[in-house]
Amino acid sequence: MMMVMQPEGLGAGEGRFAGGGGGGEYMEQEEDWDRDLLLDPAWEKQQRKTFTAWCNSHLRKAGTQIENIEEDFRNGLKLMLLLEVISGERLPRPDKGKMRFHKIANVNKALDFIASKGVKLVSIGAEEIVDGNLKMTLGMIWTIILRFAIQDISVEETSAKEGLLLWCQRKTAPYRNVNVQNFHTSWKDGLALCALIHRHRPDLIDYAKLRKDDPIGNLNTAFEVAEKYLDIPKMLDAEDIVNTPKPDEKAIMTYVSCFYHAFAGAEQAETAANRICKVLAVNQENEKLMEEYEKLASELLEWIRRTVPWLENRVGEPSMSAMQRKLEDFRDYRRLHKPPRIQEKCQLEINFNTLQTKLRLSHRPAFMPSEGKLVSDIANAWRGLEQVEKGYEDWLLSEIRRLQRLQHLAEKFRQKASLHEAWTRGKEEMLSQRDYDSALLQEVRALLRRHEAFESDLAAHQDRVEHIAALAQELNELDYHEAASVNSRCQAICDQWDNLGTLTQKRRDALERMEKLLETIDRLQLEFARRAAPFNNWLDGAVEDLQDVWLVHSVEETQSLLTAHDQFKATLPEADRERGAIMGIQGEIQKICQTYGLRPCSTNPYITLSPQDINTKWDMVRKLVPSCDQTLQEELARQQVNERLRRQFAAQANAIGPWIQAKVEEVGRLAAGLAGSLEEQMAGLRQQEQNIINYKTNIDRLEGDHQLLQESLVFDNKHTVYSMEHIRVGWEQLLTSIARTINEVENQVLTRDAKGLSQEQLNEFRASFNHFDRKQNGMMEPDDFRACLISMGYDLGEVEFARIMTMVDPNAAGVVTFQAFIDFMTRETAETDTTEQVVASFKILAGDKNYITPEELRRELPAKQAEYCIRRMVPYKGSGAPAGALDYVAFSSALYGESDL
C-alpha cells in the first residue's frame, strides 16, 4: 500500500465510529452524512451502488461477488473475505454454522479486525449487520473504504480527503472547463474524470472532442474507458450524478480513489524510467566524448607520423635554388600546416580534462584512451616532432651556407685557374727553345738573365698554384657537385706546373754551360729586367686583387675591405714612381743602343716583358680602381640595408619576447592563486585571452621581418637574443597556458555547480592547495598531498593513502591537480546516482522480477534509450525466465565500471 498521510474529516455513523487518527472533524462530517441519508434517498442509492461495485472490485480477486450489500454481508463470511483481500492478512477461522449466533460471531470477527487497525466503531453492532440494517451496513463499508483505500492518500502533508482533492486539482489543472473544488458538484459534467484519464493515458480519450454540455456522454465515456482499460469497475450512474443537485461525496471519493491507486503505479514507473534515461544520457554523452577524443588523437598522431619522415630527410640539393625551395616549403609548414595542429593538440587536452571531470562527477571510471593515445603519448610524439623540426631547420640553414660558400669558392677557383692558365700559356714552348745555340755571348747572357727573371716569376706563382690546389681540396671536402671537373682542371694545372719546373731546371743548366763562353752582358737591360719583373708581378697581383670576388656578411667586414682598398690606393703614387724609374731604365737602354747601334736595342734579352706591357697593366690597374670603389660602395649599401633589417627585427623581438615572458608568468600566477568568484576569474581570463589574440598582429609583423632577413640571406643578429624560433615557442606556450588555465576554471565551475560549493569553500580549498604546492606549478606531489590531508585531520595509513591516490590520480601521473583535490574533498556531499539506485529503478519497470524483457523496456523507455539497453544487456541466465529475458543487474554494474558490458 502507498505510505501517505491519513485523511482528515472523513468517518461513518452519527458519532458511532471514527477512523483511528481522523480527529473530531472526521466524526462531525459523518454525523452530517447520517442526517443527510435520512433526508436524501438519492444519496443512499448512489452509495449503495458505489459501495457494492467497490466491494466486488476486490471480491472478484477471491472469485466471488455480492448482489445485495445489506443481504450478502449478513452471515459475515464475505465480509471477512473482503477484509482479507484488501488487507492482505488472514482473519480468524469463521464459524461454519448457519444459526444467528454463528453469523453474529463471524461479523464480530470482522469488526474486531477493523478495530485492530485503529478504527473506533461506535453504535455499530454485529446484530444490526446480521439483521440487514442498510444504514449501518453502508456506514461499516464506508469505514472500511476510509481505512483501506483513502486514509493512506497524502500529498504535501495534507489529510486524506485534502490530499486526494489536491492530487485531482494538480492533474486536471491544464485542462479547459475543469475546476475541481470538491467531491460532488465539480464532477457532474464528467470532464474532470475524462481529464484524469487523459492526463495519464492520452491514448484512451480524445479530450479535444468532449463538450461541457454533454455531461452524461462525458461520464459514460469515463466509466467505459476506466472499466475496459484501467480495470476500474463502474460504480456510479451518469444519470444519477447529473440529476442530483449535489452528488454523494462518499461515492465520488470512493470512485476517484480508485483512479489514484491505478495511476500511482504508473507515476512510479515514469519516475524510474526518467532516472534510467538520465543515467543513460550521461553515459552516452561520455561515450561520444571518448569517441571524439580517440578520433582527434588518431588524426593528430597520423599527421605527426607522416610529417616526421619529411623532416628527417637530410638529402641535400646541388643548387641554391633547390635548397631555397626546400626552405620555402618549410616556411609554409610552419606558417600554414603546423598552427592548426597546435590548436588540435590544445583542444585534445581540453576535451580530455573535461571528460575526466564529467566522469568523476558522475562516479564513472576514469577514461583510459586506447594504447598509444594517452595525452602523454601525444605529448611525447609532439616533442619528437619539434626536436626533428628544429634539427631540420638547422640543417637547411647550414646547407644553404655550405652551398653559398661553395659558389664563392668555385668562382674564386675558376678565376685563379684562368689567370694561371693564361700566365702559363706558351711557357713550355719557350723553355723548350734552343735559341742559345747560335747566340752571341751577349745573347746567351741575356737569355740566362731572362731565365733568372722567369724563375723569379715562377717562384712568385708557386703560392698561386698552392692556393688553387687548396681551393680544390676545400671544394672536395664540402662535397661540391662539380668536384670531378674541378679535380680534373686542378690536376692538369699541377701536372703542367711540375713540367714547368723540370723544363726550367733543364734550361738553366744549358744557359750556365753557355755562360762560360759568353761574357758580355748589358747591365742596363739586366737592371730593367730585375726591376720590371717584380713590378710586373705586383701589377698582376694588383689586377688579380682588384678583380677578386668578396663574400661579406656585415658592414664591419665591408668597411674593412674599403680600408684595405684605401691603403692600396695610397701605394699607387709610390708604384707610379717605380714605373717611372723602370721606364727611365728602358729609355736609357734605348738611348745607349741607338747611340752605339747595338743589336739588342730592339729587344731586351733578359726579359720578355716590354715597357708597353707594364704601361698596359698600369692603365688596367688605374681603370679597375674606380670600378672596385663602386663595387665596394654597392656592397656597403647592401650591408647597411641588411643592418637596418637586423635592427628592425631586433627592436620588435626585444619588445615581444619580454611581453610574452611576462604574460606567461602572469598566467602562471593566475593559475596558482585566483581571486574573486569563478565567474570573475573567468571574465579576467577571457580578457587576458582576448588581449593575447589581439597581440597576434605583432607576431605576424615580426614573421614578415624575419622572412625579409632570410630572403636577404641574413642568418645572424647581434642586436637581440631572441630568434624567431624563441618567439614562436614562447607564443605557442602562452596560447597553451591561457587555454589550459581557462579550462581549469571551467572545470571548477562545473564542479562547484554539480556539488553545490560556495565561493568561500572554493577559496578555502585553493588556499590549502597553494600552501602545500611547494613547486607552485598547480600540482601537488604525493608527499605534499599526504601532508595536506594529515593537516586537515585525516588519519592515513599506507593502504588508505594508496586507495585515495588511486581516486585522485587514476592515470598514475604522480601528481594531484587542483581539480582532483576538489573532487576528493567534496566527494562525501555530492548527490549522485549509484548502481543500487539504477538496479532498483529497473526492478520497478520489471515488476519486481530479477530480469526484464525487451517489450517492457520498449513500453517504459523512449525508443532510442530502450534500443540502447537491449543492445547492451546480456541474456538473463537465471531460472524461470522467458526466452529473450535480459540481465539488468549486470548492465547497471557495467555503467559504473563494476563489470564489463
From Swiss-Prot:
Pfam families: CH, EFhand_Ca_insen, Spectrin. Keywords: Acetylation, Actin-binding, Calcium, Metal-binding, Repeat. F-actin cross-linking protein which is thought to anchor actin to a variety of intracellular structures. This is a bundling protein. InterPro entries: Actinin_actin-bd_CS, CH_dom, CH_dom_sf, EF-hand-dom_pair, EF-hand_Ca_insen, EF_hand_dom, Spectrin/alpha-actinin, Spectrin_repeat. Expression restricted to fast (type 2) skeletal muscle fibers (at protein level). One of its GO terms (cellular component) is focal adhesion. The modification N-acetylmethionine is found at residue 1. This is Alpha-actinin-3. Homodimer; antiparallel. Also forms heterodimers with ACTN2. Interacts with MYOZ1. It comes from Homo sapiens (Human). Signal peptide: none annotated. Belongs to the alpha-actinin family. Gene3D superfamilies: 1.20.58.60, Calponin-like domain, EF-hand. Residues 760-795, 796-831 form the EF-hand domain. Ca(2+) 1 binds at residues 773, 777, 779, 784. Residues 1-261 are annotated as: Actin-binding. Ca(2+) 2 binds at residues 809, 811. The lineage of its organism: Eukaryota, Metazoa, Chordata, Craniata, Vertebrata. Spectrin repeats lie at residues 288-398, 408-513, 523-634, 644-747. CDD domains: CH_ACTN_rpt1 (cd21214), CH_ACTN_rpt2 (cd21216), EFh (cd00051), SPEC (cd00176). One of its GO terms (molecular function) is calcium ion binding. The keyword Calcium applies. Residues 45-149, 158-264 form the Calponin-homology (CH) domain. One of its GO terms (biological process) is positive regulation of skeletal muscle fiber development. PROSITE patterns: ACTININ_1 (PS00019), ACTININ_2 (PS00020), CH (PS50021), EF_HAND_2 (PS50222).
